[in-house]
Amino acid sequence: MTHLFALSELPLDEIHRLLDEAERFRSGRIWRPAAPMYVANLFFEPSTRTKCSFEMAERKLGLHVIPFDPERSSVQKGETLYDTVRTLEAIGVDAVVIRHHEDAYFEALRHAVGIPIINAGDGCGHHPTQSLLDLLTIRQEFGAFTGLTVAIIGDIRHSRVARSNAEVLTRLGANVLFSGPEEWKDETNPYGTYVEVDEAIARADVVMLLRIQHERHAETMGLTKEEYHARYGLTLERARRMKSGAIILHPAPVNRGVEIASELVEAKASRIFKQMENGVYVRMAVLKRAMEGRMEHGRMAEKWHVVQ
């Protein structure tokens, strides 16, 4: 089954294949399934970029998108995530994309459903497609990962982006630096070294800024937005100390004037909107992988045989 739960479960050669496939889609490749295929997007947390880019990717691939709104579904009547996914499988959906507030929600589904599941973010756990689009953006800029220094700055403890990126970047040969408030350090993450923010920015080839995950905090932030920006944000002054050729990434949504000065969001070094563009191509590659796996192993195999 071609699930995608976390990049840590994929070998590097498969990650490179997905990036190569995304580049082919960026260059204009067209792929269509041999027969109608259906996908449902189950987003139990707010999303703009991830949800819309998945929908764009699905339509570019010619897939049929089944509307699903948790607020108007039987989830409101107490239906479990498992029963929701099994229902969609039973009515003929070929794959589901899920964002959920619970860490590792997919473990209850991994061996229990017969259709591919694509993780669009699980709590503080993993965000594999965000990491893939970040990798694609970095590779477009530098050509490779070995020897690069990537500084991940901000709310490390609560960030699934930090967790996913640090692991895969380390496997790819990059040097990962962490920086941020002491109370948001993640001492359980072995894939980076903590340094002061000024050092991280000065050393980095890639400055990756993180949104403060207010919705995951048990307590409110002890700093005002202005204080956070001054202490930990990418200010105009800090940006002037970046290496020549260094780039700025941010998974968005961006809080202008908090983790990054508003003037830097679309500055020459910023690749923030390039990341969003790449997100469509990466998700096309991931969906193609899921659908081809479905053709080989699931209900679609029978359809495929019939239409030959």
Curated annotation (Swiss-Prot):
One annotated GO biological process: 'de novo' UMP biosynthetic process
Gene3D superfamilies: Aspartate/ornithine carbamoyltransferase
Positions of carbamoyl phosphate binding: 49-50, 99, 127, 130, 252-253
Keyword Transmembrane helix attached: no
Reaction equations catalysed: carbamoyl phosphate + L-aspartate = N-carbamoyl-L-aspartate + phosphate + H(+)
Any GO MF annotation of the entry: amino acid binding
Major enzyme class: transferase
EC numbers on record: 2.1.3.2
Pfam families: OTCace, OTCace_N
Assigned keywords, A-Z: Pyrimidine biosynthesis, Transferase
Record-linked NCBIfam families: asp_carb_tr, PRK00856.1
Main function: Catalyzes the condensation of carbamoyl phosphate and aspartate to form carbamoyl aspartate and inorganic phosphate, the committed step in the de novo pyrimidine nucleotide biosynthesis pathway.
Family that this chain belongs to: Belongs to the aspartate/ornithine carbamoyltransferase superfamily. ATCase family.
Name of this chain's protein: Aspartate carbamoyltransferase catalytic subunit
Species the sequence originates in: Bacillus caldolyticus
